[in-house]
């Protein structure tokens, strides 16, 4: 009511017209007008602001201050305005309203009573790298978690221990895979510790989880890196104690090198200075003990202070650290080992530990860094060590802090720091030692060893004058030595022994625990660090190792896994008087604490060498296996004589820089830290100075290494350079008398850091100098650790046991493998016998059987991966490798594929061997093959023995290898070769790259193996490469990264497809030879997968290979031209790689087969001696071992593939040629027109033609592959016909690049290079070629692709020409040379390669298929050369090849090959080798060789301007091709057992028609295909550099296709075209109508096109409800294995299962928002309860495959098949329970588990979390990753988007 001033303020009008008296109505109107017909509130209500309200200027007579319009005539008709002034007076005196008595704010109070809580998040205190101080151990790292564990579950699990700040589960960034690692940050340290204590090693969801305190997440990061690198899988990830042994050298090295070394150095130095409290602060013992306890408290402060070390001593680790720091450079040497060392030894850790250690302060020059902050005091204190300790003590807390701060401070100067660190490290040790000097207590052997490690007393270069300061007898005031009392305690022999033992025991216990926490067993560190070199058979050696070992044990655990060990080490190590003396000096001062430190340190270092690791036993080599690298440093140290007693022992432990004495002139070894603290500082200074110049130059690298590694490196280097370069002060020398300048330059803690950083040789001595030779007061000679013998004995026993266990396990594995193989063989035989009646057995089958018989049985030894490796030696089978090297028996069922109608030979359906089995078989067969290299299939089919290819592939390659091997193993042996070739080709792209990558490894292993016998070589290579790759493989085998899985699966899938496509005979023979083949095939397969441009195998093996090759029967070779070519290839491969561009001839090994195009069998025979060229035509095919390692650089890379293509000069047959993988007819030498037969210029070295195009993958069976199989029979004869697959290229390009199908845009591109156009349907070679006719000729082009089939069906049956019809493979007879087949024109394969018999009966000279197919002269078109043209995406890697284009659509990825008449092609130089072919014919228009090396690298360049003309030329070419194709197809159809309908041939278009089509774009626009061709042509022309200036000025701008199909152009939809057109043209207006089941089939989960012959091999198909044909067997296998592994601990599950029987959960199914039907809980379900069993029919794989097809045919789109294991599948499609309705979710509330109940495996669904009523039950299907993605509809926040 009453509106007071406030309102008036709002309403105050600027120009009141009246004072506020009522306005007359007229005024109102005026006001309205004035104010825009807006009643101004100011008019109605106002306030007198000391100025008249009215503008009239009337005198204000009123006394009111405000007014309000009570009645407004505008609102109330007929009234006058009534105002109220000041709430009391009204303008109308007798107005009936009462005045306002209470004045209040008219605004609505509710608006103000409401308030929003401003919740400003309080930033959490974040501990980053700049944090100074011990990082509170509130962060817990979980490892080995079940992949069903999600944040919510983890939070619930941890919150009971205390409040949680953060929970994070780590996923693989690439594929979002659960890594089994998680981080939980608690609010309090207590909660974190409780969580670790209660959760560590407990079973969660069936997994024994690893839980550890990880304050800075370093361990977690390390685990993460290892998992990401593929080194480990979540289940094999080494954690805790395992870590030390298990860390792979690479991952560890990477982790260590990540910066930790430098950081450690920094941290170590600084922390030592600032952070280390004088040992005096705490009794050294207590410090050490604290260290150990601290270590126990916190797994490790690997670079992060975990729990403040009370002593300020970081950990005994710190000592280790010091040792680590001590000689970063040495560590560099260690670096190798560091790989072996667990990352826990990271510098950071060590540094932290080190820094924390009070002793460090003594030791460090680095401390000086810390001191830098307080350098003066430290210096001051230094002379009086105790003060220094005080200083140090103060720092100790900072130690952690300092260590970080210092670290950060010193980070920039890392290299210097490093130096400093080196100094520091020695100093640290020295500090430790110094402590002992405080009291001369008898040095405990334990601690002494650590410091003593430097057997040779480092004699630092005389430090600058500052030395003198330290000159103060250290003994008198051991720097930080604990107070004399403490010292005395320590010094007292009993107390010290007790201390030593305690640390020893503790270390054994605590240390172990700590170590385990760190993730490495006690000895692990040492063992990890380095297996004890044999030189150091004794502990002392380990001590030396210790000294050297760059990485001390983890701060906490690694530091000194065994305190006693340190002493033992020290004792054994250097009980030399010098050592003893140093030890005693050091040890005494150190006393127990030092001992402990020493122990720790030594344990860090010792641990590295660790008593545990007997010098003789490198941690069972298994522990560290790969990880362990023998410490050269140790070896050096071992070799290094112990310094004379007078001299300080080489106290520098691994962590300590060698005293300058070793490298006085080299700063590198600053100086072994003397045991005397004083000396150590000097050493630390000296370290950098002493490090050899080269070492200094390499410091940055060293810095990257773990400290221990650095230390070892430096010490090794220093020692090796001058073991005792620096003079040792006379033992008698007075410490005071001995200036630091003498033995050790004085270190001024303060100055040291700076100096070190700046490279000053010696900072001012901040620490008292002690004569290293003079024992500190109270020094008592250290006594050997009484427990050393016991420890050694125990270790030895343990190692023996481990070895025995490993051997037993491995033998069992091998036996299982053999048993599996035997079973497979038996199965194959049974299947063959059973099917013999059903399907005619082709001759090939018999051959296969013969081959099988011929195949020598593999010996068990061949199966043993360590067959080559020394027992369980590092190389052979390391424990580190664990079982990784061993292939688990594969669970995959080998299914025989039903004979393809097209397959001409064996009808037997091959049961694809399980990938794993195949891999095993492959390995074995590889070995066998190597051993039996000479053995040839009696049948005369191409020798089964493919060059065994070492398993070099990376996980991807391996898997591919495995898969291809597996799948291919299915192929008959002879088929196998071609198939292998093809698969090799296929995989060669990928594999080539992988091989190239891995080659170095595998070659190294190969070379090693090559030395040994073939068998050994094969086994060793397989075992080694196996261990190389198998490490990745095995780890990756089932869990390999999803990429691998994908690739492998893809590969397998592809292979499966290939197998399907392969002729049935391949299958048949495969089945018969599957066992033999599986072995040989697997070999081959492995090899095949491995193929990458082979770098030559080690020459050593070459002789064997050659011998083997020669051993091959010539007759056989005759039968197997492909083999001959393979042999050639092998020979070539055997030959050392020729220099780039050098002709093969130049290679050391001459290929007998340089045959230009020999027509005669003799040449064939010659070739026969050679291995058949691998399909890739590159060494890839040949055994890696035999293959000389050819640097990839040697060959330009095929544009399509990264695989290098060997550039061979004319003299050599391009490797591609050697590999007749594509059987292209060579032009008969007699061919009159050489040009017509354009041999690919030899310059086109081997661009191996890809074995298969991506489309092949799409097709279950590549018809081409079938042909390949037949061709094998034929092609072996016609090896020349086969076109080598360019290892690097996805597909071979043929024809003018312009027209080459590779060119996407090329009118002649065959939609699917691979014969298989439609993914599902095997096609006859001719049919396979479908080209998108961009140009009228395109139709003709298709003819070019068909694979030549031999005239004789026998031949066809025997061998498909090639796995994939390569470029115009079939009628390519037209191609003058195999050039047609080779992606690049290459010298034609010697006719010898082509068995004349292979030629069709028409008997044209085998030289060319053209000839083989009689054709009218006009029919003989100008020979066409298939020039591989890199697609734009040519670079598309192997993956492209593997990409599954189910639809046979040409993907840009698919290279398309077009055949161009040779005439159209610019002449390419012909190889001299092919005299028949005029080199002219192959010359570019420019006259330049078609390919220069550069050009070779760029396939595209090969095609000259021809592109421009190619469009036109293509027509005639196409005509001839068509005709030829007609012939060929006719022949093929005649010979093929099941002739697929001939591809219709069309008359070539006239020029007018061609032009009409060309210019039709103006009428109808241009379609996508033409755009693609144009783009390809454009790109090719750009690459040709034919002086088309206009091209350079032309920029390709993408434009959408304009030809969307005209009304007239609308073609009738065929049924297969897809869903019918909507009558109304719009689906929305159509409503619903029934879709034909056939139409639906396309969209069913298996989007497999209906093929004339259904895919026989559905092995990988959607078993776990996986819809796709492409389901990879590999990933299936891995997922199976994961399930099986997880089902091992299922006792509790059984209990739950049994409980379920009594009380089933109430659940119902109803419509789900996720997809169709879903399962919902009708009652609350608690976490981890059994929800339901997945019930269905238990069926075998074969039945599952059949049913899957049937279900697809019936239109059942969903798959309810759930795989239980490799041979059992539960099919709930038609009978089952509600479980089948459970939908997938990326954030499921349940998980599936396989449990065994009464010997029956059951799939049970368990709840992961509490499930509420009406909540849908979901679990993660965990489909293997595939290319064809199934969209995920779960809608979860973290939805992956796809099921697979």
UniProtKB/Swiss-Prot annotation:
Ranges for the region named Disordered are 18-58, 269-288, 295-562, 838-871, 890-1108, 1160-1341, 1367-1499, 1647-1678
Query: Biased-composition ranges for Pro residues?
Result: 383-399, 455-483, 1225-1243
Ligand binding (S-adenosyl-L-methionine): 1821
Q: Basic residues compositional bias: what residue ranges? A: 1437-1447
The SET domain sits at: 1705-1822
Q: What is its main location?
A: nucleus
Top-level EC class: transferase
Protein name as it appears in the record: Histone-lysine N-methyltransferase SETD1B-A
Q: Which organism is it from?
A: Danio rerio
